[in-house]
Structure formats: C-alpha cells, structure tokens
Amino acid sequence: MQLSEDQIIKLAPDAASVKAGKGLASAAKWVLRGASDRALWGHCQGSGKNPYQTQVDLQNIAFKCSCPSHKFPCKHSLGLLFLHASRPDL
C-alpha cells in the first residue's frame, strides 16, 4: 500500500510533526530501511548512541518506534512514510 503525501499529513498529530517528519525523509538519515507490500521499517540515527527502530504497518495503519516521543505517530514514523512516498524504490 502506498500512501500519498496528503494522506501522510492527515495522519500527523500536528504541523510541527509534519515539518520534523519531512526533515527525516532523506535516505541519509536512515542507517537501515526496508519495505514490503505490508510494512515499512528502518533505523533512524538520532542524537543518541543508538538509532531509533521504526516500524509502520501499512495494512492496519499502525506505528511503532523506540523513540521517547509522546506524539503518535512520531516524526520518525512520518519521516519513513514521507521517504517511501517520495522514493518507493529505496
């Protein structure tokens, strides 16, 4: 399942999360990433030692991330979605 940018924006909790997510929509921000028809996953290097492990279930539109954010979905999940929407070949 492929989500459009507009669909991703509607999932975001606020405009700041959209902006932060778009800032993470670069392959260089992700040390590992993968995709299937049903899910996206990746490791996003934050400011800490260990990258955040992010998963997006495309079938049920569900999110999981190891970051400490209280926003749902977090900027990492949104970033992974924006990256996939702009570059599904990655």
Where are each of the predicted segments found?
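Long, low-complexity, compositionally biased intrinsically disordered regions
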Residues: M1-L90
